[in-house]
């Protein structure tokens, strides 16, 4: 295993010995990303009209989370050399010398295979196949290729982070319907303005690490224009669940106000281009974009899971 790691990744020499504990291995799984995956997959389960055994649902959510963590672990294994250079990632377990790269690779591969097999046995093989595709797409297509090859890295790579609602729906129904597809598209279109806002502030870090993020390749002004363009697409897309009948009054209000706020903040980023004001505007959009996505999916969860759904047509009835 060590020879494979050594031949593939320059991170091989970062740590001669491991002194990592359980917390360090858990950190390899990117717990915050795992939490978001659990949440969005749960919403994907909830927006369907079908039901699933609670035990199967719980096991499935756990396996989806483990699969997401496994892909994060493989990402950290591959990117350990880059993480060692960037200020916000240099304390991660591998560059910090707490866990050896070969250990991280073995850990990630074991969790990947185990989570896919368990999800297939607990739920169905469509859900397991989608999880396997998600892991492979993030760990191989994004981490090993796109991230260091193109400024469109997070645009294309964002598909991996957008798939959990589709996996959740597949767990319950054995298929993927319009609901899962729309939730996928919302997260997919949300990803570029979210990450590019951060990249505007951290462009120096990315440049030092040799990562071709949009601000470093196309320039800050072009990035700002693209942020506005994606947000203009995201705002109406966020209302699609209402138009398709699985988002109600609560969701519609959250999507409308949240979309307008996203637009306002993206325009601030566009107009504030220099000094502390520029960084403040970018971080403001970055922070609010997280809240926006959380509120959107929370509204769907409240309506469908807690019985609070009221159709928008009631306003005109």
UniProtKB/Swiss-Prot annotation:
Entry EC no(s): 2.5.1.141
Source organism, top-level taxon: Bacteria
Disulfide bonds: none
UniProt membrane topology term: Multi-pass membrane protein
Catalysed reaction, written as an equation: heme b + (2E,6E)-farnesyl diphosphate + H2O = Fe(II)-heme o + diphosphate
GO CC terms, sorted: plasma membrane
CDD domains: PT_UbiA_Cox10 (cd13957)
Subcellular localization, as worded in the UniProt entry: Cell inner membrane
Protein keywords: Cell inner membrane, Cell membrane, Heme biosynthesis, Membrane, Transferase, Transmembrane, Transmembrane helix
Gene3D superfamilies assigned: UbiA prenyltransferase (1.10.357.140)
Pathway linked to the protein: Porphyrin-containing compound metabolism; heme O biosynthesis; heme O from protoheme: step 1/1
Enzyme class: transferase
Coiled-coil blocks: none
An individual GO BP term: heme O biosynthetic process
NCBIfam families: cyoE_ctaB, PRK04375.1-2
Function statement: Converts heme B (protoheme IX) to heme O by substitution of the vinyl group on carbon 2 of heme B porphyrin ring with a hydroxyethyl farnesyl side group.
Other facts noted in the record for this chain: Carbon 2 of the heme B porphyrin ring is defined according to the Fischer nomenclature.
Identification of the protein by name: Protoheme IX farnesyltransferase
Organism (species): Methylobacterium sp. (strain 4-46)
Gene behind the chain: ctaB
